[in-house]
Design a protein with these regions (language model features):
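Gram-negative/organellar outer-membrane beta-barrel architecture
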Residues: 1-2, 7-149
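Short, well-ordered amphipathic alpha-helices
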Residues: 18-24, 51-54, 155-161, 202-206
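Short, functional N-terminal and low-complexity linear motifs
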Residues: 16-21, 122-125, 163-167, 230-235
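C-terminal outer-membrane beta-barrel translocator/porin domains of Gram-negative envelope proteins
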Residues: 153-158, 164-250
């Protein structure tokens, strides 16, 4: 099943794309698997392609393969901050955000794989990995991040008592994942520096049937990142832009 997509936003102007998805059952498995593809191009020369899926394998011992991979190329404008020393000779000692933006190019590819194994009917535990390869071409700046390679390893725990994965009418879904990531040596004015990241994500949903055709649903979702490197006053992670202005601050 596929549909065309047309959208408009002030950040990306007109966007044109397509979304495809397929549902199927793998051998010896009652749960339904899904594979999705989507891609978009904007009139500001921003574009991305993305593929993701949730596959169920095994008979009585069910395990999942959840994956997400893609590539994006998003020219954008980065509004950095200035420091005291930048304008010390001019007598301006304030700290704040620069009024004039800096054009830059953000190109990144990513791969996320999770493989939870069901230890009983509702609980699954398994490993996960997250890989990010990014290239930031920032004009008129002393910071070079070219390329940035980050590899993260961790684990995921999930609980799923929903009566239907795609159109649930009752049940609870809870998922917690934690990863630790390492980057390659990043070139900065003071030398080379590696970055260590910790990421904690949680997703909690509940579906409560109120009547025959009315369902109350709520969701809590959060993602926390910790980053450690010695030179703290240099922003090694600028905004990673997405179409429509939904930026991700790394």
């Amino acid at each position: 099943m596929g549909i065309p997509v047309v959208n408009y936003s002030p950040e990306s102007t007109w966007e044109f794309g397509a979304a495809l998805q397929g549902y199927f059952r793998l051998p010896n498995q009652e749960r339904i698997s899904i594979v999705q593809f989507d891609g978009t191009y904007s009139l500001r020369n921003q574009w991305y392609v993305n593929t993701q899926g949730n596959l169920y394998f095994g008979g009585k011992k069910t395990w999942q393969l959840q994956f997400r991979t893609g590539y994006s190329d998003c020219p954008a404008t980065y509004y950095g901050t200035y420091h005291d020393s930048y304008f010390a000779n001019e007598g301006n000692m304030n700290i704040g955000m620069l009024r004039k933006g800096t054009p830059y190019q953000s190109q990144r590819g990513y791969l996320n794989i999770q493989a939870p194994i069901y230890v009983d009917e509702n609980i699954a535990v398994g490993p996960m990995t997250d890989v990010l390869v990014a290239r930031f071409d920032i004009q008129n700046t002393y910071t070079t991040i070219n390329p940035l390679v980050q590899v993260a390893l961790g684990a995921v725990v999930q609980y799923d008592s929903r009566d239907n994965v795609f159109y649930p009418s009752k049940g609870i879904f809870a998922k917690v994942s934690a990863t630790a990531g390492w980057t390659n040596k990043v070139e900065i004015p003071q030398g080379q520096q590696s970055i260590i990241n910790g990421l904690l994500a949680a997703d909690l949903r509940q579906y409560i049937p109120l009547s025959h055709s009315l369902i109350l649903a709520w969701q809590f979702k959060t993602q926390l990142m910790l980053s450690r490197y010695e030179i703290s006053h240099i922003t090694l992670y600028p905004m990673l832009p997405r179409l429509g202005g939904q930026d991700g601050l790394r």
